[in-house]
């Protein structure tokens, strides 16, 4: 049985604990050694393996590099003791702390063969043993990126034969069609793009004033033509949305006569009186209220004008 021991050090240097678990639980406490960097006290029988110098404490390395570095240093710094050589297949678990986390490893010795290293290093980011499966062990370079993008664009068979014409100063992005088969090309464009002229931009700013041609100004009417048209059509039934101020409708002579008669009786209108006038003149109560307000303002202006003239 192989167990792993994980301890969090209080110092900066990487720490590795190495122990032999082949002799039972009692041997675990005896064959256990902790050291910092590579400075450790000598012992008659200890299986010790320090971390390679290439692994800096502040760097994170993938599992493949850790396994290769551990395999290269196992033959130099680790010599199996007699207790390990006497067992049929003894395994030694070890691990070290780096700047990215803890990397546990296992080294097994067999009769008649040299010490082989069996790594089970896992990524510090994932605590499960399946973290290596989702770990990217190869650094992506520019050539790999170019080749992968070339394979991606190889799927778009209709990129070269796109029905759309390239427009200057715009990003040339292909329209991705269905992979099952090319669709029918569109022969008409959404907007007339023939009159487009790219603006000249220099390092110091805009290169003078740029004026649009007459054809370019006419293209803007395509977006605005639908709004006045809908308003003009909706004016007949009055059900659609109306923009702007409502058209003023003058009162008839019969309505004005009735309103003036009520105003001569009382300048301020009550609620019951407003309802009665609204029913007689075929006006809304709001219209009646507004007319009385305007009539009082008009009379006040006339009185002030007479006072100022006299």
From Swiss-Prot:
Q: Does the keyword DNA-binding apply?
A: yes
Q: Name one Pfam family in it.
A: Homeodomain
- Any single Gene Ontology cellular-component annotation: nucleus
Molecular-function annotations in GO: DNA-binding transcription factor activity, RNA polymerase II-specific; RNA polymerase II cis-regulatory region sequence-specific DNA binding
Predominant location category: nucleus
- What residue stretch is flagged as signal peptide? none
Question: Keywords assigned by UniProt?
Answer: Developmental protein, DNA-binding, Homeobox, Nucleus, Transcription, Transcription regulation
Biological process terms in GO annotation: fin development; negative regulation of transcription by RNA polymerase II; regulation of transcription by RNA polymerase II
UniProt keyword Disulfide bond present: no
Residue ranges the UniProt entry marks as DNA-binding = 244-303
Which domain of life does the protein's organism represent?
A: Eukaryota
- Where found in the cell? Nucleus
Q: Could you say which protein family the record assigns here?
A: Belongs to the Abd-B homeobox family.
**Protein function:** Sequence-specific transcription factor which is part of a developmental regulatory system that provides cells with specific positional identities on the anterior-posterior axis.
Protein name as annotated: Homeobox protein Hox-A13a
Query: Which organism does this record belong to?
Result: Danio rerio
- Gene symbol here is hoxa13a
């Amino acid at each position: 049985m192989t167990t792993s021991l994980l301890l969090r050090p209080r110092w900066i240097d990487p720490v590795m604990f190495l122990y032999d678990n082949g002799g039972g639980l009692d041997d675990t406490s005896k064959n256990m050694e902790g050291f910092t960097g590579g400075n450790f006290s000598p012992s008659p029988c200890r299986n010790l393996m320090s971390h390679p110098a290439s692994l800096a404490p502040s760097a994170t390395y993938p599992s493949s590099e850790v396994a290769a570095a551990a395999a290269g240093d196992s033959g130099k710094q680790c010599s199996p003791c007699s207790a390990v050589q006497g067992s049929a297949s003894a395994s030694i678990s070890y691990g070290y702390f780096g700047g990215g986390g803890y990397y546990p490893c296992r080294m097994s010795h067999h009769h008649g063969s040299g010490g082989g290293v069996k790594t089970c290093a896992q990524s510090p980011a994932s605590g499960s043993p399946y973290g290596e499966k989702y770990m990217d062990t190869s650094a992506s370079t520019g050539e790999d990126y170019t080749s992968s993008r070339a394979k991606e664009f190889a799927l778009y068979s209709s990129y070269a034969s796109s029905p759309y014409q390239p427009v200057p100063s715009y990003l040339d992005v292909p329209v991705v069609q269905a992979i099952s088969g090319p669709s029918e090309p569109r022969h008409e464009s959404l907007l007339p793009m023939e009159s487009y002229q790219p603006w000249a931009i220099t390092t110091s700013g805009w290169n003078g004033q740029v004026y649009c041609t007459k054809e370019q100004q006419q293209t803007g009417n395509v977006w605005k033509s639908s709004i006045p048209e809908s308003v003009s059509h909706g004016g007949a039934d009055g059900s659609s949305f109306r923009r702007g101020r409502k058209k003023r409708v003058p009162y008839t002579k019969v309505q004005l006569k009735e309103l003036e008669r009520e105003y001569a009786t009382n300048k301020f209108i009550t609620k019951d009186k407003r309802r009665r006038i609204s029913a007689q003149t075929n006006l809304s109560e709001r219209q009646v209220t507004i007319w009385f307000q305007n009539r009082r303002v008009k009379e006040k202006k006339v009185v002030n004008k007479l006072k100022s003239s006299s």
